[in-house]
């Protein structure tokens, strides 16, 4: 009887310990999710405030009213916030990357405006949206948002704030490549060719990679450059951003209901997190949470 009671107590103790451990992990995960959400929400609020200050509705109203509207009408993308997070991960203040993050948002806004023009030949998977301005105005405004983003970058070249002109120039080159024919334009063009008969995992991944993937890769690389990262760190974060953006595209864009997408997303998550293995510390956990919100170190 004594032996049986002893075994019972041991099992109870083990069960209690296991439950306690699970409770600790669960509570830590909940706290981590809340902290990570706050981390990204704060960054996005700062970017929005910066853009509202940079693009107020002012004279000439015919130019700045549609630009202001289209800047904030675009759906949320995490690429600008990733730019800030990468800069902070490299040990620099987010103010160093704010203009770059805003420029990346403007690129996203410009392409969103062009994608949703009420014209024939629009991708079959693009829903109708409400238009506040004539198509010609939205077309021209989208064209104007791209150079305006580069203007924000050039104006941020303040030596008194330790902004290195060479870094700014490199970031401008990164963003112009993103906006060019081998970047998002390529993805948009390939998406135009899609129809119900030719959607397979290969074309889905390609379109998502060239659109959201390249956008996030650019954001992460620009943040790392402005944060003072070494070349290997910049390239690791570029690859991380590419995987993150491709995942985001697959989750929310073309082919999101296609069979095999979930399996591909899980593989991309593994590849993305692998790029961060050499980066340590609290900020690494924060930047990882863009694809794994419950990531926690106990």
Regions found by a protein language model. Give the residues of each.
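All-alpha prenyltransferase/terpene-synthase fold signal
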Residues: 1-298
């Amino acid at each position: 009887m004594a032996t049986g009671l002893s075994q019972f107590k041991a099992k109870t103790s083990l069960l209690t310990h296991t439950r306690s451990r699970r409770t600790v992990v669960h509570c830590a995960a909940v706290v981590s999710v809340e902290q990570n959400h706050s981390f990204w929400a704060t960054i996005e609020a700062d970017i929005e405030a910066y853009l509202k200050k940079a693009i107020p509705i002012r004279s000439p109203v015919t130019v700045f009213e549609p630009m202001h509207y289209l800047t904030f009408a675009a759906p949320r993308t995490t690429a600008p916030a990733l730019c800030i997070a990468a800069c902070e991960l490299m040990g620099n203040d987010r103010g160093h990357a704010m203009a770059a993050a805003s420029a990346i948002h403007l690129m996203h806004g410009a392409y969103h405006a062009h994608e949703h023009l009420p014209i024939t030949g629009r991708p079959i998977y693009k829903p109708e949206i409400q238009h506040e301005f004539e198509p010609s105005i939205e077309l021209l405004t989208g064209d104007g948002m791209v150079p305006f983003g580069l203007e924000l970058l050039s104006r941020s070249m303040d030596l008194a704030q330790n902004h290195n002109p060479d870094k700014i120039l490199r970031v401008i080159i990164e963003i112009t490549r993103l906006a060019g024919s081998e970047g998002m334009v390529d993805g948009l063009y390939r998406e135009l060719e899609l129809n119900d008969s030719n959607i397979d995992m290969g074309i889905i991944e390609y379109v998502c990679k060239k659109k959201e993937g390249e956008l996030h890769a650019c954001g992460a690389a620009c943040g790392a450059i402005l944060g003072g990262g070494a070349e290997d760190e910049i390239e690791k974060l570029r690859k991380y951003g590419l995987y993150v953006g491709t995942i985001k595209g697959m989750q929310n864009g073309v082919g999101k209901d296609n069979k095999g997408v979930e399996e591909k997303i899980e593989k991309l998550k593994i590849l993305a997190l692998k790029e961060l293995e050499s980066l340590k510390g609290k900020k690494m956990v924060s930047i990882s949470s863009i694809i794994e919100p419950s990531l926690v170190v106990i």
